[in-house]
Amino acid sequence: MKVISYNLNKHKAAGELDALVEQTGADILCLQEAVADELPDEISGLHLADSTARNRLGLALYYRRNTFTALQVRTLALKKSLHDRVLKPAEERMLAVRLRDIDHGRELIVASFHAAPLTALNALRRKQIAAALRELSSLGDGLPILMVGDYNYPVFKENLGQQVRAAGYELTLSDARTYTRYRVFRGHYDFATSVGFEIDDITTLPQGLSDHLPILVTART
């Protein structure tokens, strides 16, 4: 299974999505900072499962309909940062879809996630991530879960890694940094947390119009 996660930087990189899906053969596309009203129903054979409705810049998830059936969609509003309160509404920070693999008859959960920006403390982001992981576990007991997105967590990942492992998940970074705007804050912002998946690799794809670089997760259950 191939999953792309991409922060579109205020929808600026939306025009790149067809080519990204075609070039990578992605089965699932998870977006952050997307303008829901401007998203198409289909992107190179991937169907829009859902997008967040209340956010200024929201989340979306696309999947390949000849590979998966979408069974359930859930969004989650997380503890707000000052940034969220000033630039409201920006509350729905996770979008999860429960899918059935048509060929293998197995169910799994994939989620697009966007943590609070760098103006917030790492402690708040850790709380948001923990809440998202708990919600995902409640969506399907014992199912494989993959949450990808912009975690806005470039430094001190040891603390985050310990928390993620304590919750029963694994944290996996890509092979190269995913954010380039600020020299001081360059690093791995976009990565994956998972349980029940074997992550073969996570590749950082070439940069486009966004300040984030898309990542390609190759995983299997």
PLM-predicted stretches and their roles:
Residues V3-H11, K79-P89, T119-L121:
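Acidic/histidine-rich helix-loop elements
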Residues V3-L8, L17-P40, Y62, V97, ...:
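Active-site beta-strand/loop signature of hydrolases that rely on acidic residues for catalysis
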